[in-house]
């Protein structure tokens, strides 16, 4: 999982990326290709 301060560029890496808020943190999840998981902050 990548950790970045900006999530905007990470959600554009793959067309199936979804931005999800969990426990006050912003995550990018991808069910078809889990390599693109990321977290903000």
Curated annotation (Swiss-Prot):
Keyword Ribonucleoprotein on entry: yes
Keyword Metal-binding: no
GO terms under biological process: translation
Alphabetized SUPFAM superfamilies for the sequence: Ribosomal protein L36 (SSF57840)
GO cellular component: ribonucleoprotein complex; ribosome
UniProt record similarity statement: Belongs to the bacterial ribosomal protein bL36 family.
Designated name of the protein: Large ribosomal subunit protein bL36
Upper classification of the organism: Bacteria, Pseudomonadati, Pseudomonadota, Alphaproteobacteria, Maricaulales
Gene: rpmJ
């Amino acid at each position: 999982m990548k950790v970045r301060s900006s999530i905007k560029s990470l959600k554009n890496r793959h067309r199936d990326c979804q931005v999800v808020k969990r426990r006050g943190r912003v995550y990018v999840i991808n069910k078809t290709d889990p390599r693109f998981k990321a977290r903000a902050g």
